[in-house]
């Protein structure tokens, strides 16, 4: 391909938002951790899923086929979460999710979602996340 000789209009997207098709017969709630069902469709995260991000709004695909609805997910940022066993000494610790609203410092079969950036109080911390980095982890 030759180098540009003129302006090109390119469709850019917001860097921290992605839209993903939703699995059939399910609802993903605002704030949920969203995972991949291994077929390319978003669902409420289950342990071991690929981490798509956090749901920006509720998406109801209960009566739809797979892909009829899309969900907007935040793919990077920082979020305050309840984390089982979190103490002030856990700054920098890896955080995992076992479902769409359960967070822990224990890896086992859970999904890595980010790292503790700030301790808020016992069992609550701010987690930084970036789905492109977690995908490579």
What residue ranges belong to the model's regions?
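Surface-exposed, low-hydrophobicity beta-strand/loop segments enriched in small/polar/acidic residues
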Residues: 1-137
